[in-house]
Structure formats: C-alpha cells, structure tokens
C-alpha cells in the first residue's frame, strides 16, 4: 500500500516558487489613481464621485475653516466659558433623548465636535507656551473643579421670560 504525503497532494507543490508568485489574481479588477480609474474590463469602470457630493464636501470644509477662525479669535477664558455652555447643552440633549422628547439627533455630533475643536485650540496654545502634557492635565483638573454649575444658555433665556 502506497502512502501519499500532504506535500505531494498540494496543488502548489508541483509549481515552482517563482511561477506561483506571478500567477494573476482573478479578484483584481481595477486600480484607482487619483480621480481616474484604470480597469481591466472597460465595462466595469466605476464612476467617480458626483459633482454635487464634492461640492457639498467643499462647503462643509469651508464652514469648518470659518468656525476654526472664530474659535482661534476667542480668548482662552471665552473658550472655557463656551465649552461649559456647550457641555450643558449636550446634557440637556441627553435628557431630552432619555425622556423621548423631540430633538435633533445631529446636534450631538455637532456639539461634541465643536467642544473637541475648542479644547484642541486650547491645547495648541498651551504647547506654544511650553506647557507639557502633565502640567496641562493638572491645570485642566483645577479648571474643572473651579467650574460653577449654571444652566446652559437655552434655559437661561426661558427663565428670563
């Protein structure tokens, strides 16, 4: 009775190593270079992004740049006040969600991103002043402990009326 080893049964065992590495892959259909797509089959060419989508992305980027300019124009104290107000608004949104009241779901990400941008600019300023990470965290802890809890701007307007 003849025994057959697994190496002999393998389909790659009979193909020399250099030839097996050069075998074409059937899954390869196209290469994307910049905006153009070079395909193996002309009928499978994928259309580039629609012009409307690109235009919308450009508008969003311009708004983001404008918002960053506004944030950079603020003083550090104004930024800290704004962060406290935005965190209060975020808390109110969470309350509305838990109470199943009507709210805009997109406001969550918008506010969180604005808070993150402000804190990033604040940290950039600290780096310019030469404050290291450890001291920055220490100052941040002190700042958080010194925050006076107050209602966010949206509730302040309701109380005055």
From Swiss-Prot:
Q: Name the keywords, alphabetized.
A: Chloroplast, Plastid, Ribonucleoprotein, Ribosomal protein, Transit peptide
Gene Ontology cellular component list: chloroplast; ribonucleoprotein complex; ribosome
- Name the principal localization, coarsely classed: plastid
Q: Any idea which GO molecular function terms this record carries?
A: structural constituent of ribosome
CDD domains membership: Ribosomal_L29_HIP
Positions of disulphide bridges: none
Transit peptide region? 1-61
Which Pfam families does the annotation name? Answer: Ribosomal_L29
Question: How is this protein induced?
Answer: By light.
The processes (GO biological process) annotated in the record are: translation
Localization: Plastid, Chloroplast
Extract the NCBIfam families matched here.
Answer: L29
Task: Tell me the protein family, please.
Answer: Belongs to the universal ribosomal protein uL29 family.
Outline the subunit composition: Part of the 50S ribosomal subunit.
Which protein is depicted?
Answer: Large ribosomal subunit protein uL29c
Q: Which organism is it from?
A: Zea mays
Give the lineage.
Answer: Eukaryota, Viridiplantae, Streptophyta, Embryophyta, Tracheophyta
């Amino acid at each position: 009775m003849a025994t057959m080893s697994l190496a002999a049964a393998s389909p790659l065992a009979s193909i020399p190593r250099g030839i097996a590495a050069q075998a074409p892959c059937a899954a390869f259909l196209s290469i994307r270079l910049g905006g153009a797509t070079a395909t193996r089959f002309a009928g499978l060419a994928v259309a580039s992004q629609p012009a409307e989508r690109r235009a919308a992305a450009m508008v969003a980027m311009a708004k983001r740049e404008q918002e960053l300019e506004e944030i950079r124009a603020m003083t550090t104290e104004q930024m800290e006040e704004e962060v406290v107000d935005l965190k209060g608004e975020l808390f109110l949104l969470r309350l509305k969600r838990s109470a199943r009241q009507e709210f805009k779901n997109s406001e969550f990400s918008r506010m969180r991103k604005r808070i993150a941008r402000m804190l990033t600019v604040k940290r950039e300023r600290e780096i310019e002043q030469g404050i290291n990470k450890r001291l920055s965290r220490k100052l941040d802890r002190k700042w958080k402990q010194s925050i006076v809890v107050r209602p966010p701007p949206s509730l302040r307007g309701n109380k005055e009326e």
